[in-house]
Design a protein with these regions (language model features):
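Small-residue-rich helix-loop
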Residues: 394-492
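Charged substrate- and nucleic-acid-binding regions of tRNA-handling and nucleotidyl-transfer enzymes
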Residues: 478-543
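Residue-level signal for inorganic ion chemistry
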Residues: 65, 96, 136, 140, ...
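Short hydrophobic targeting helices and cationic amphipathic motifs
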Residues: 1, 6-8, 12, 16, ...
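Conserved phosphate-binding loops in nucleotide/dinucleotide-binding enzymes
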Residues: 119-123, 146, 233-234, 252-263, ...
């Protein structure tokens, strides 16, 4: 009702003779209708098919449903749509649930979760769909079709030969096909009694406009002459996606259907099915596509790893043992992954980019979801990860590193200190150990390029003198080391660059890192002096090779 009133408002505004009070009254009516609509319990669903791993676009759909439900104090459920058993992939359903759990957006109803509208797997609801299909036939909105696969293929070939490559079973061609609209009633009854294979097809009305309002895209109008007579019920006794989807959404009291743009072409059929049953349709919202980084085409499952980044939330291993990488195993935090996905197609209307899940719930609205596709940016994704890693407590990161590296030989307190020194420079938690390996052991490799560029003839002499100063520091902490270092530079009349970088290279082997006085304090006096004594001859050998 609300979209129809909005349509009236727009028409009245364009009419110069319209009384302004009329527009005001219509707008008040819109507000009233919105209150009525939102007074109904919000129930949304994420309805993936278990045909393989869950693509990040699917995770975004689940996320937007979750945010919308939480925003409106509603219910978010998951329904597994496995009507196409030929494409069923073992393990896919478990993968989907595990991925949602890792992302922190678990539904409150679904397989294994309970709920009063179950079962939540369509193959387990098989018995309930046939009566609905038969009801449509009885109401003359659908019909039995007995055409065999061979006969349909023959029709397609004939159409191609006549210059019509895109043959469809529709309101025009159905009159020449083998179905209950063309066969005598007695023959239809006999075929059904004999158990002849058949499907039930939607009887698409001819030359009618189907109008519906999309919460993201506005009004959508499609003429039925552009639609074919889709199969609703298959010969194997299973419904197709279209029938099962409508029946399940209705019987599960779904208030809003929030799904990907790829389902927009099916929406007119779904609207007609609701009308045929005499049911109120839910609100529709079709989300924009996720695009490749260059903007050329949809980001697909086949792009996984091929473009240099994952497209799945977690690792997926095929039956043949082929691995497709996921964000979890790459080291991404779920908070960073979800934060990134939320902003792929939705704009909060403010400069804010870092959101907790609760903040996303508070800020989210379908009105700010874009109509156009959203380009995925792998570098921006790393930025979100870096930002979220820096927000983590040092103790939590250290605990995680101990869990993933059980042989790590370092105390909890020391590791926590190491994390504090390194996390500002890291993208992933594991970078702290790989990039900061010199904290745990004397380096076996050196930044030879920097050594050759920065090492002067007098540098080794300065470092030997600096070692003597280090030996004399009684309380070996960062502040005392810095004070001694500045005193040495002042005494010798040297600039900081003449000694600090060579000092770093002789202790860590690398030319950059956390503050060198902090690094020195972490390692301790004995370790620093031992390393310098061992490494200065190695550096001299590198210089001699040059």
């Amino acid at each position: 009702l609300n979209p129809h009133i909005l349509f009236l408002v727009n028409n009245q505004k364009s009419n110069p003779n319209t009384n302004p009070k009329t527009i005001i009254l219509l707008r008040l009516l819109i507000t009233f209708v919105k209150k009525i609509i939102m007074s109904k319990p919000v129930r949304v669903r994420f309805a993936p098919s278990p045909t393989g791993p869950l693509h990040m676009g699917g995770v975004r759909t689940a996320l937007y449903n979750y945010l919308f439900a939480k925003k409106h104090k509603g219910t978010f459920l998951i329904r597994i749509e496995d009507t196409d058993q030929t494409r069923f992939v073992p393990g896919a359903q478990e993968y989907i649930m595990d991925a949602l759990s890792w992302c922190g957006i678990m539904p409150s109803e679904g397989p294994g979760l309970g709920g009063e509208f179950g079962p939540y797997v369509q193959s387990e609801r098989k018995a309930m769909y046939r009566p609905y299909a038969e009801e449509l036939v009885a109401k003359e909105h659908a019909y039995y079709a007995f055409d065999t696969a061979e006969e349909l293929e023959q029709m397609r070939e004939q159409a191609k030969q006549m210059g019509m490559p895109n043959w469809q079973y529709n309101s025009v061609t159905r009159v020449s096909m083998k179905n209950s609209l063309t066969l005598p009633h007695t023959e239809v009854e006999q075929r059904l009694a004999n158990g002849d294979p058949y499907v039930i097809r939607m009887k698409m009305p001819r030359n009618e406009d189907v109008r519906f309002h999309d919460l993201i895209r506005g009004w959508v109008v499609v003429n039925t002459n552009n639609l074919d007579d889709k199969v609703l019920f298959k010969s194997d006794g299973m419904p197709t996606y279209h029938l099962a989807n409508i029946v399940d959404d209705y019987t599960m009291n779904i208030s809003h259907v929030i799904r990907g743009e790829e389902w927009l072409p099916s929406a007119p059929l779904h609207v007609l099915l609701y009308q045929a049953f005499g049911w109120d349709a839910p609100e529709f919202a079709h989300l924009p596509l996720l695009l490749r980084p260059d903007g050329n085409g949809k980001l697909s499952k086949r792009d996984g790893d091929r473009l240099g980044f994952p497209v799945f939330p977690t690792n997926w291993i095929t039956a043949e043992g082929e691995l497709y990488s996921g964000y979890r195993e790459k080291g991404y935090l779920p908070e960073a992954f979800i934060n990134m996905l939320a902003l792929l197609g939705w704009n909060p209307g403010t400069p804010q980019e870092i959101f907790t899940l609760d903040e996303l719930v508070e800020a989210f609205s379908l009105e700010r979801v874009s109509k156009s596709g959203a380009k995925f940016d792998p570098e921006k994704t790393k930025w979100f990860q870096q930002s979220w890693l820096r927000m983590q407590a040092d103790a939590d990161i250290a605990k995680g590193l101990k869990e993933t590296n059980p042989t790590l030989n370092i105390s909890d307190s020391a590791l926590e200190t190491l994390v504090g020194l390194m996390k500002e420079r890291a993208t992933f938690a594991e970078d702290i150990l790989t990039d900061g390996a010199y904290f745990l052991a004397n380096p076996s490799e050196f930044d030879t390029e920097t050594i050759r560029k920065k090492w002067k003839a007098e540098t080794s002499g300065y470092l030997n003198e600096w070692m003597d100063r280090l030996t004399g520091i009684s309380e070996f902490n960062s502040a005392n080391i810095e004070t001694a270092f500045k005193g040495y530079l002042e005494e010798k009349g040297l600039g900081i660059g003449a000694v600090l970088l060579p000092y770093r290279l002789s202790v860590t082997g690398v030319g950059a890192g956390p503050g060198m006085f902090d690094v020195s304090a972490f390692l301790g006096k004995e370790e620093v002096l031992t390393r310098m004594k061992e490494n200065l001859p190695k550096i001299a050998a590198i210089l001699n090779e040059a």
